[in-house]
């Protein structure tokens, strides 16, 4: 029986390797997944299990998320919202979550379809740029931190003027940053204004620093009727570091000279005491911040494309923001096409993509998720976890051309296997000879 096992093992091994090479075994899968149970997802209605409706549709039919994950405790999602929307506007949801492997499937609820402009003759493209810069900062930082939440930023302003809401469009009202009105004892906006704010309780904070990107005209209370160039900065009073920028474009807020809107940069600031300074026009300062806590070993985030069905206008800003090495982007090639709920919810292909959250995988890489850690035809780029070695399969040749590292590893394993086989053969031959001699 021992000789039979020795004879079958090499054939079985060759058969398994042959099947892997011929049929593309362990190819990267276009899914989002995780290496273990230490993961978390931030989403919108497509992963919001708490959404309630009374339109007669089947329960949870709006989800792209598998309903089995609804009670996992690993989802922070809100119908009609997004991280960007909550960060800047009064329409707020307190996104909160923690994990080693972070997944984002949101962003579509602030898109060209909404057409937000800060001013009547503003520019929605400015806000698409803001969106891209915001998510780039969030993705970069969440590759380094476990925990994300929102916090309010307290400030102290020594003047008499009150906060003002100057950025409104349809249902959206901007409240981050906060703008301080012009002091009544000044004739125009040519004066320096400042306020102090404190960041405490988190390892880092993401805050907005924004300016109007062109010529801002004074209000009706400004008898000079002048145009102003916005200038804003934040000064760290503990370290002496200054962050700031000025408006640079030749645009305004009139029908003949349109395009004036808010341009934001998203700073990652450490805890401390800060001073917000405006040299001209309105003082602005952060009212909310994203709180980053619990540094971790670097682990790229996974971002699922968040877009509408083609009947609505979408953008690709999350794709623009999702860059290597801190982010892996996942998408489908087909138009988003919802099922029983509406065309914007319950897409079959996106449900397949998110189904990877039901299981652990061995490796997560740029190309996708690898189920196993043995051999694949694709070398995992930027791989994390226990990743497979790769073989470059030459279908037009009778042999496979392996990458150097896998060849060395497989050669060592093959040598060890040969030694074991020779040892077993000699052992059984010697043992059989002894038994024949004794008989």
Curated annotation (Swiss-Prot):
Keyword Cytoplasm among record annotations: no
Physiological role: Structural protein that makes short spikes at the surface of the virus. Contains receptor binding and receptor-destroying activities. Mediates de-O-acetylation of N-acetyl-4-O-acetylneuraminic acid, which is probably the receptor determinant recognized by the virus on the surface of erythrocytes and susceptible cells. This receptor-destroying activity is important for virus release as it probably helps preventing self-aggregation and ensures the efficient spread of the progeny virus from cell to cell.
Modification(s) after translation: N-glycosylated in the host RER.
Record gene name: HE
Enzyme nomenclature, EC number: 3.1.1.53
Glycan-modified residues: 94, 196, 246, 309, 316, 331, 360, 374
Entry GO CC: host cell plasma membrane; membrane; viral envelope; virion membrane
Keywords assigned: Disulfide bond, Glycoprotein, Hemagglutinin, Host cell membrane, Host membrane, Hydrolase, Membrane, Signal, Transmembrane, Transmembrane helix, Viral envelope protein, Virion
Quaternary structure and interacting proteins, as annotated: Homodimer; disulfide-linked. Forms a complex with the M protein in the pre-Golgi. Associates then with S-M complex to form a ternary complex S-M-HE.
Virion surface-facing ranges: 23-407
Region Receptor binding, residue ranges: 133-281
Cysteine pairings via disulfide bonds: 49-70, 118-167, 202-291, 210-264, 322-327, 363-387
Signal peptide limits: 1-22
Name the record gives this protein: Hemagglutinin-esterase
Similarity section: Belongs to the influenza type C/coronaviruses hemagglutinin-esterase family.
């Amino acid at each position: 029986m021992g000789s039979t096992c020795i004879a079958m093992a090499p054939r079985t091994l060759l058969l398994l390797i042959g099947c892997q090479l011929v049929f593309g075994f362990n190819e990267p899968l276009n899914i989002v997944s995780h290496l273990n149970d230490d993961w978390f997802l931030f989403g919108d209605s497509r992963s919001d299990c708490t959404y309630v409706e009374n339109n007669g549709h089947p329960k949870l039919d709006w989800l792209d998320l598998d309903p089995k994950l609804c009670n996992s405790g690993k989802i922070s999602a809100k119908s009609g919202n997004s991280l960007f929307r909550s960060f800047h506007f009064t329409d707020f949801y307190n996104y909160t979550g923690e994990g080693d492997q972070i997944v984002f499937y949101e962003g579509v609820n602030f898109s060209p379809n909404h057409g937000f402009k800060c001013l009547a003759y503003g520019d929605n493209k400015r806000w698409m740029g803001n969106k891209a810069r915001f998510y780039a900062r969030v993705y970069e930082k969440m590759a380094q931190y476990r925990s994300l939440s929102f916090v309010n930023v307290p400030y102290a302003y020594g003047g008499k003027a009150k906060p003002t809401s100057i950025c409104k469009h349809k249902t959206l009202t901007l409240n981050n940053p906060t703008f301080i009105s012009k002091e009544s004892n000044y004739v125009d906006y040519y004066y320096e204004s400042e306020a102090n704010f404190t960041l405490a309780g988190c390892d880092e904070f993401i805050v907005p620093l924004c300016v109007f990107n062109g010529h801002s005209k004074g209000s009706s209370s400004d008898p000079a009727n002048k145009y102003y160039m916005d200038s804003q900065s934040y000064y760290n009073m503990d370290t002496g570091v200054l962050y700031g920028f000025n408006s640079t474009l030749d645009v305004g807020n009139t029908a003949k000279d349109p395009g004036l809107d808010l341009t934001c940069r998203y700073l990652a600031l450490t805890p401390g005491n800060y001073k917000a300074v405006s040299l001209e026009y309105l003082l602005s300062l952060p009212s909310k911040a994203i709180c980053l806590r619990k540094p971790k070993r670097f682990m790229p985030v996974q971002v699922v494309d968040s877009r509408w069905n083609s009947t609505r206008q979408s953008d690709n800003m999350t794709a623009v923001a999702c860059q290597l090495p801190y982010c892996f982007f996942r998408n489908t090639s087909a138009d988003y096409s919802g099922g029983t709920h509406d065309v914007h919810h319950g897409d079959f292909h996106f449900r397949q993509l998110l189904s990877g959250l039901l299981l652990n995988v061995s490796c997560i890489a740029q190309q996708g998720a690898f189920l196993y850690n043995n051999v694949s035809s694709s070398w995992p780029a930027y791989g994390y976890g226990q990743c497979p070695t790769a073989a470059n399969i030459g279908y037009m040749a009778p042999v496979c051309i392996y990458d150097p590292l896998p060849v060395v590893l497989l050669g060592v394993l093959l040598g060890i296997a040969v030694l074991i086989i020779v040892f077993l053969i000699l052992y059984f031959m010697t043992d059989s000879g002894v038994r024949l001699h004794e008989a």
